[in-house]
């Protein structure tokens, strides 16, 4: 039974489809409308997941070629890798904390101004796993582990979307949907940077192309060509012989590079199609939940939901974030610290999202500089998170996104300086502050 529940809540397509169905039922929609809304939401999320898989499958070989081409070694942050190891020991605790965290998230949304229902199931699973490991080693077991872990997760699920909601309103033009992706600290940094030094009237989507290059306005074309240049350069440095022998199963290195570039663009195209399908269904369906269960609540959805608003910023953000990762790596090598290699997957998904958010608040400069700083942030946070995880027996692996780093460091410090009491007091104080600010007159999302 527990495995069945874990499978449901960790499968975003099923989880969000059930949420959509619940919303439509609460609105007393007719059965055909409920079935249609649930299925289209389910299929939309599968389309997005499929597109993300295509992108990830095109980026993994790039990372291998990049490391070989430039003779690099170090730690590549990867959520999936560390979670796969941790679940073998902490699987049951993770499942219970995940379920408890979702309940606390709904309760916090119901009784505070943090009206965000976090619906990104795989990120919820990863965060629950990290919390389970840290609290277990701190000495918590059974019910205290589940309740405190669930409370910590519920708090993070509620606060994370709030970090960036101001910029989501600027991006979407309304306050109906939130961003549910545990790298919101980086997105906030990008949006804040854009608002300080950027000019949002000069959008990445208004970049002027000469008439002879007008075809580059098509995002699929521009992404394919840009990525082809990047892939071919790395393939040349890696060497065709190495690629044919180790990666491409005999396909010529340059041909393989072109294939990966096209695969990357295809993945982005599929993601954008899925996002459009989801947003057409989940936002109206969520109205029922907002009206009946959690007044004024907002669905917090995975990061690809923002890509349709600024496709050019997606590519600009990815490249800028990756450059930030390269600069950070050079600093680490020079300073003699542990070296964090720029993981292409987190730099794409987090960098692209930071680019879109930065563009909303500061145009081209916001997208470029904001995503660059976000790339530096997700490079250095793992350096400080690794001692926390290293002491738990996970040397050589770490989480990739900003909120994992921030949350893990805070929980680790509370445990280090106050042991179990420190963690309990810290979580209670954070929850008290959340309730406290909820009694203050609430500003609009644009003012927050």
Regions found by a protein language model. Give the residues of each.
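Hydrophobic transmembrane alpha-helix bundles
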Residues: 55, 72-73, 88-92, 184-188, ...
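Signature of multi-pass transmembrane helix bundles
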Residues: 1-51, 92, 96, 100, ...
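Short juxtamembrane and helix-loop transition motifs at transmembrane-helix boundaries
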Residues: 1-3, 56-61, 76-88, 103-115, ...
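Mid-membrane cores of alpha-helical transmembrane segments in multi-pass membrane proteins
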Residues: 70-76, 96-102, 122-129, 150-154, ...
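Short, charged low-complexity intrinsically disordered segments located at boundaries
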Residues: 52, 68-70, 92-96, 183-188, ...
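Membrane-proximal extracellular juxtamembrane segment immediately upstream
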Residues: 51, 55-56, 63, 336-340, ...
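Membrane helical hairpin/interfacial module
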Residues: 44-95
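Hydrophobic alpha-helical bundle architecture
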Residues: 110-114, 303-383, 387
